[in-house]
Amino acid sequence: MRIILLGAPGAGKGTQAQFIMEKYGIPQISTGDMLRAAVKSGSELGKQAKDIMDAGKLVTDELVIALVKERIAQEDCRNGFLLDGFPRTIPQADAMKEAGINVDYVLEFDVPDELIVDRIVGRRVHAPSGRVYHVKFNPPKVEGKDDVTGEELTTRKDDQEETVRKRLVEYHQMTAPLIGYYSKEAEAGNTKYAKVDGTKPVAEVRAALEKILG
């Protein structure tokens, strides 16, 4: 089962990716992890990636596709894989197709921007333990304090409203066109495309995914 997850940052992909990995026994492939592993391994592709990153440039689509091909040929991907954060653009999706990387399901997590802003901006973290709260959906017992230690909670830089809105603009410009791309691919019988209502509670989203994936 080869799956691509689409959706804006904060749409709940991470939570459900965990569930899909456990239920279907497939690994999640993130391009960031893949690049780090390739550089660490010192492979030919890793060396190329390191040179590009050391020069402060963006790794080319060709190189990322080559890394994806190498990664999915590994034993743990025998039953499939879950791609999150890639492809991000139509040229990347085209390059994947040309490289013969076929996908069984493309799942779009649909959540309105304002709800995403609400979800992310309301997050508060206790940095030492990694505990995460939300002012509206999962508040601490005492406002601004960690339940266990009573220490101050903080807001991550990435969770500030300005940053979140900027990331959403980027998503709509770069990645949202993939929704049309994969809808057409599904019409042509090349993949299955499903839109998931990401505003629903976690358990309901999970049940919807089970129904789609079987």
UniProtKB/Swiss-Prot annotation:
Keywords: Acetylation, ATP-binding, Cytoplasm, Kinase, Nucleotide biosynthesis, Nucleotide-binding, Transferase. Its EC number is 2.7.4.3. InterPro entries: Adenyl_kin_sub, Adenylat/UMP-CMP_kin, Adenylat_kinase_CS, Adenylate_kinase_lid-dom, P-loop_NTPase. One of its GO terms (cellular component) is cytoplasm. The modification N6-acetyllysine is found at residue 192. Pfam families: ADK (PF00406), ADK_lid (PF05191). Coiled coil: none annotated. It comes from the Bacteria. Signal peptide: none annotated. It catalyses: AMP + ATP = 2 ADP. Monomer. NCBIfam families: adk (TIGR01351), PRK00279.1-1 (NF001379), PRK00279.1-2 (NF001380), PRK00279.1-3 (NF001381), PRK14527.1 (NF011100). Belongs to the adenylate kinase family. PANTHER family: NUCLEOTIDE KINASE. This is Adenylate kinase. It comes from Escherichia coli O127:H6 (strain E2348/69 / EPEC). The gene is adk.
